[in-house]
């Protein structure tokens, strides 16, 4: 300890404060000194309860300063932050193996995280980009159903593309079978999927991993995961859950929780209904909402984004709940009774793209200005694969509140409140309203288009004089001339796969690679 001429006391630089009561080296307890303790008395650090000094290269080595004001006799302890925001101690697991039945038919031939969004991206790009922007460079993606296009996209977008993973990695882990009876099972749920790869965190390259971030591959949001992890570490929690306040209309679709005034989860229920749902209502002013906002959103919903201490995760999956298959319905509710589960409020846009309706509305919301979510954030971009496509070519067309992706051709058409995906072709006198076109995987040359038309066939894209609204058009679809897609009868559900379309929640979905012939009315 050194006392300078200007009455400044400083502890030696390598010293770090740690809580001996918890044994956690990454948390700090600061001593509080009143005037009487400093003025005219010798400072005795050994008398401070539950605090000891330790020198370690694993700590942020900062100097503790205490200023003595001889006039006012006041003292101040400079608040220190010893916890490093070190993403190298975090590994991320993105769950991408679900069957995606609620998003069918968009998931008929692709995994849910591979579903296109925003005209040029895929859902998997959202958590991947959040990891990159947060500095987390150790990422695993667990896949099972229809994973071919997802694997191809990940290989093109995130391997050897200069995004700076350094000593990190992006690894796709497909569901596999191994010798023995227990090794013949596919993933039975989110927790079981992670359990089957628990050995990854016993590997030598995972020795520095302290926390495991569990993410879903079908959400739309922008989040700094290190803020979340920092809160988790400072709270001392075993598990942390990112949450949002939510209204009555959607509450039963999510895991709901009750928390105490310190943010600790005291009760958790996965997708409750009826009286069980009403029992989960809380006063959400505890989250900082106004009284009016709290009345509109009386529930606290899990985002399905979790942080586990590595040792706790392995203990839960291997020993404490070895037969539990799902995080939301089994692991989290049980853990809330025995472990310290912390709630982290995410106060920004978040959408679960789990149904055709939510997918449709989230896409069209991107056309609004200002939008609740934007892909146009240069500081925290959403990455995707490089396609080297030219700008879109638009001839004598009218565009209203729409997004036109690169490489498209629009001729003498009206596009209103719609998204046009990459490589799209929209013919003369076409009217699109409230429509999401996912685009095409390849171009047809002008000669090929002319030949198809001469033979009475339909090229990729939308033929002239066609009118479409309230519709999702999947990739490589061929919609002919003079077609009307409007669902004028208001049908909510229909399966017409032989005719190239489904209707889900009143939204017409044109199937991938399907053909809608000239003059058809849907």
UniProtKB/Swiss-Prot annotation:
<dbReference type="InterPro" id="IPR011831">
    <property type="entry name" value="ADP-Glc_PPase"/>
</dbReference>
<dbReference type="GO" id="GO:0009507">
    <property type="term" value="C:chloroplast"/>
</dbReference>
<dbReference type="GO" id="GO:0009570">
    <property type="term" value="C:chloroplast stroma"/>
</dbReference>
<keyword id="KW-0809">Transit peptide</keyword>
<dbReference type="InterPro" id="IPR005836">
    <property type="entry name" value="ADP_Glu_pyroP_CS"/>
</dbReference>
<feature type="modified residue" description="Phosphoserine">
    <location>
        <position position="428"/>
    </location>
</feature>
<dbReference type="Pfam" id="PF00483">
    <property type="entry name" value="NTP_transferase"/>
</dbReference>
<keyword id="KW-0597">Phosphoprotein</keyword>
<comment type="pathway">
    <text>Glycan biosynthesis; starch biosynthesis.</text>
</comment>
<dbReference type="GO" id="GO:0005524">
    <property type="term" value="F:ATP binding"/>
</dbReference>
<keyword id="KW-0934">Plastid</keyword>
<feature type="transit peptide" description="Chloroplast">
    <location>
        <begin position="1"/>
        <end position="54"/>
    </location>
</feature>
<dbReference type="GO" id="GO:0019252">
    <property type="term" value="P:starch biosynthetic process"/>
</dbReference>
<comment type="subunit">
    <text>Heterotetramer.</text>
</comment>
<dbReference type="InterPro" id="IPR011004">
    <property type="entry name" value="Trimer_LpxA-like_sf"/>
</dbReference>
<keyword id="KW-0021">Allosteric enzyme</keyword>
<keyword id="KW-0067">ATP-binding</keyword>
<dbReference type="InterPro" id="IPR029044">
    <property type="entry name" value="Nucleotide-diphossugar_trans"/>
</dbReference>
<dbReference type="GO" id="GO:0009941">
    <property type="term" value="C:chloroplast envelope"/>
</dbReference>
<dbReference type="Pfam" id="PF25247">
    <property type="entry name" value="LbH_GLGC"/>
</dbReference>
<dbReference type="GO" id="GO:0008878">
    <property type="term" value="F:glucose-1-phosphate adenylyltransferase activity"/>
</dbReference>
<dbReference type="InterPro" id="IPR005835">
    <property type="entry name" value="NTP_transferase_dom"/>
</dbReference>
<keyword id="KW-0150">Chloroplast</keyword>
<keyword id="KW-0547">Nucleotide-binding</keyword>
<keyword id="KW-0548">Nucleotidyltransferase</keyword>
<comment type="similarity">
    <text>Belongs to the bacterial/plant glucose-1-phosphate adenylyltransferase family.</text>
</comment>
<keyword id="KW-0808">Transferase</keyword>
<dbReference type="GO" id="GO:0005978">
    <property type="term" value="P:glycogen biosynthetic process"/>
</dbReference>
<keyword id="KW-0750">Starch biosynthesis</keyword>
<protein>
    <recommendedName>
        <fullName>Glucose-1-phosphate adenylyltransferase large subunit 1, chloroplastic</fullName>
        <ecNumber>2.7.7.27</ecNumber>
    </recommendedName>
</protein>
<comment type="function">
    <text>This protein plays a role in synthesis of starch. It catalyzes the synthesis of the activated glycosyl donor, ADP-glucose from Glc-1-P and ATP.</text>
</comment>
